Amino acid sequence: SVRVSRRKTTPLTMELLVVDETLDEIIVVARGRVADPFGPVSNSFLNREELRSAVGAGSDVMRALDGLPGLISTGDFANFSVRGRGPRDNLIFVDGLPFDRVVHFDQTLGEEEDIGGGGRFSIFAPNSIAGADFSPGGWSAAYGGRSGSLLELEVAGGGPTPSASLRVDIAGVEVGYEGPSGIHDNTTAFFTARSFDFGRVFELIEEEDIGQPELTDIVLKTVTELDSSNTIEFLGIYAPEEYSRDIDNVLASPNFEDVALIETEQDLALVGIAWRRLVGTSGEWTNRLYFRDNDKTSVEGEAYPDLVPEGTPAADIPVRENLLTVGEAETEIGWRSDYSMQNRFGELQAGVRAWQTDVDYFVTLREDWDRFVYQTTDPRPPGQQYITLMPDNVDSLYNERETSYAAYGEQTFEFDSWDLRAGLRYDRDGFSSESLVSPR
């Protein structure tokens, strides 16, 4: 016998025996849930078990996507590129809420590969994601604003059977719970919390020059069934991180190849609530409210161990700390409403979005700084093999608050052997004061 539980994946292996009987027809369905059936053939959907057991992923949700059609991943980072676009050009939703910062250590300062790589480590613990729907292009009119790909992640919502986990290793500790909430009879909960200090790992493998990255991830989701037609979902994510690289890490660098002194601190949070309501015989109306916050400060300096004799104590090595400071603060509050129903043509979908974004960015250079790594287009005197950053040319400040909104509608026409989906989307960007109408 097989026990089937709501919102829980149960792997099952079945072997067919050879028999002499003749059967007229056998229908085999590969899976109960697939990617957008009206999207392009390159769309892909990975369930919880496939994400958890993906070869080479190391239980990292983002690395498990490697190998999907149209997706390019170097393997060194937990992010990806599509059609030559950068990792930050991808449109990412978590439980239908816009949340593009789903990886840790997406550096603003430091080595060039770290700045452009898009992050090293997913904020989601193994087994946290119930499904990942990926589309490299041609997605529904419900989505827009980015030119890369669309990735929709669904956080596990718990189940009627309680289960708990504990994992302890040299990097840190991870705990998890999935099951009834214990507060309300019709409420299930999913909770994970972990804290890792990778500095201990790098010290063990004698790679101290990397630095000391630390992270914490806390994810809580509850699903409450009010009645047969109404469901309330709550999602909370808190994922702070810290990264430091001091003079001891510089001294561990082979031949002092990297002399950067870096301090980075980031607070990342998302809170959202969704109300799903069945309307009539085939309609579904979903409303979502969310608040997300990201506050990141990055500071870079430089050490000069090559200016003193070998073996000089770390405290006596000349350094220039806090040369460059970059602040990135962004908060957003938004509302999303979607409605879908079946009609005589097929499926009709429509929705609206409204969100207010508050950004506060600044760059401050304490004093002139000679840099020997630069772009070929950076201005400098003829023959000079370095550039000099000066506060007057570097210091900047951008602080704005704007409201944006969008609306869409689309109709799917279903025929015997083919389908057609046509839609229209309107976007209004408050920062650029630009309006776009996009037929799909």
Question: Where would I find each of the regions flagged by the language model?
Answer:
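Extracellular loop and loop/strand-boundary signature of outer-membrane beta-barrel proteins
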Residues: T161-S163, L204-D209, N255-I262, L270, ...
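Hydrophobic, lipid-facing positions within transmembrane beta-strands of outer-membrane proteins
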Residues: S147-S149, P162, V168-V175, T216-L220, ...
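A beta-strand signature from Gram-negative outer-membrane beta-barrel systems
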Residues: E112-S165, E174
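Short, acidic, small-residue-rich periplasmic hinge/interaction motif at the N-terminus
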Residues: S5-M62, P87, D95, F99, ...
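Flexible loop and strand-edge segments within Gram-negative outer membrane beta-barrel domains
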Residues: F198, T231-L278, N294-D316, R320-A329
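Transmembrane beta-barrel wall of Gram-negative outer-membrane proteins
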Residues: S165, I170-S195, E208-Y243, E263-W285, ...
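Structural signature of Gram-negative outer-membrane beta-barrels, strongest in the C-terminal barrel
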Residues: S229, E330-E332, S340, F345-Q349, ...
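Transmembrane beta-strands of outer-membrane beta-barrel pores
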Residues: P136-G138, V155, V168-G172, S181, ...
